[in-house]
Amino acid sequence: EFFIYNDKIGFSDRTLSSILFYDNQGHYITSKLSQGRGPNEVLGIDQITPITNNRFFIMDEQWNLFLLDSCFRKINQYRINWNSQKSLKQLLKNPQPEDTGLYEVEYTKNRLRQWGENYLLFPVSSDTKYINGYEGKNTGLYYSENLTMALLSIDSGKVEKLICNYPLIYQKQKNLVNFKFSLFDTYEKRFLYSYEADSLIYCMNLGDTTITSFGIAGKDMNQNYKQYFTLNDASHNFSKDRNKFGYYHSIVIDPHHDLVFRTYRKGEHSPYDGLQVYQQNCLIADY
């Protein structure tokens, strides 16, 4: 994954657990970190994001978290604390969408972004045999009550809150299971998020529960998704569906020009992907 830090381009090499930096012309400058347990090493890298006070935050694929200073020295290291008060037996006996213990990091399409001074956001999922979007008595609850984002304390690594229900389109249609991942970005207290099958972009601010929305459907997208009735069938066709059909891919906020960029795939019928540009919540370009 690429990211911008000051006037440099950063790239996280997951294989080597290293961060490579380049100048704005693409010329290599230096590398930081490696895999291990030493002072300048991490156990792995799945996601990295720059945060305030010239620090960095890393999440690996085993729920390990690393807070680093500007020289990539470890300030703190901990594991995600899901803050669940129930035992696994209690959770599975009576699963409820608000139970943090039912959730895990959505590693299929993970992302890490700071929100405000003290928090980070990352996507979560809870596809268990007891509550999922495919089958079972709790399927109806999945899209109406399940939450999709976790609010993590930078200081403690504790999940303070789960937020963001699936939008109405996921409750109305039953064929979106392979396109249920979230896309989002933040800037200071502003938080924009959407979902792969939804044309709307939702906006909320830290400390305010009001949610507004904007957005227009992308051009020439094939969204005639297939419906699946079992977890196995959906999983078996996951890669095939994501190659064949169109979906929204990513959101990026450009605060300096008051712009929001959203990329999308049209589907296998088109050799091109799409790019939308919004300014003050209005679409000004769609390429």
Positions of PLM-derived features:
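Asp-box/WD-like beta-propeller blade repeats and closely related beta-sheet repeat scaffolds
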Residues: 62-66, 70-136
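Beta-propeller blade signature
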Residues: 70, 137-156, 273-286
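Beta-propeller fold detector
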Residues: 29-35, 75-92, 160-167, 211-227, ...
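Short, conserved, GDST-rich strand-edge loop motifs in beta-rich repeat architectures
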Residues: 123-144, 264-274, 278
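Loop/turn-rich, solvent-exposed surfaces of beta-rich toroidal or solenoidal domains
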Residues: 239-286
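Blade-loop segments of beta-propeller domains
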Residues: 28-62, 78-88
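Structural signature of eukaryotic scaffold interfaces centered on beta-propeller domains
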Residues: 1-4, 47-51, 100-117, 178-187, ...
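Beta-strand-rich domains and repeat architectures in extracellular enzymes and scaffolds
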Residues: 1-17, 249-252, 258-265
